[in-house]
């Protein structure tokens, strides 16, 4: 096929009576030299017996020698070639895509490497989950999944296979587990308070519980603008080294503005939320934006906020503040929410019975 010499090929030599004379092996140039062994005109036979990686030439080849002349015999071998076929299926039911367990998965990509670690080809599964290579030469190969089907987990397995026989197709079956997208957050605070009081809310179990990293990960705390406002924030710390930004929104604005940026997740910041505002303007919403967080992201020291309720809230009035944590994976949004309701109590002042006056 290439014209290159093949070393290590074994031949058996026979005399005219087809009695074995010996076994000979080609050198690095693909040649066997038999000097001064054969004199005169004669007939010999050679048979190729072993040729790793190539299709062995079958049958006896006739060689006729002549006195005083060099006889050349040249043989060509076709390489052993085969293919690899991968079938990728769902390991479980996928709530996002609707795939059922056993369904074929499209767009899984596999990179095939030879025994020296050199890239040979890239395979991509079709709508039924199948991908098949072109012809591969005899030898050992490995294959790695480099892109998983959408909303399925990428496998870290190195798949080994070998082409041994000409024309064979090595069939491989593999599964992908579904991507689980889940976040979590909880909050706690005062169940009752008085109007004009300062109260504290804690945020905890802030987690990326997905099996994949999430982009645009955020934490959003919101108070009802007619009941309370945020006065002070303690940021907490988190278990992954990231820089993040905190935004705020007030009772006077409908959009978020930067409160503090270039914050470090391993440091607690105390932030005064009353400075730089107009008269009668108060912060009602705080939003952390972390960018991309890895699997298992969570707080180490819990964040908490101090809030002040408005003075004139009536007895029995209830207000609910909410927290939301979320992110995105491959354009799929995920979020979790929690809330906490606080009730206002106001002491009832008993005036007593006024005495009668007059005549």
Residue ranges of each PLM-predicted region?
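Solvent-exposed loop/turn and edge beta-strand elements of beta-rich ligand-binding domains
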Residues: 1-359
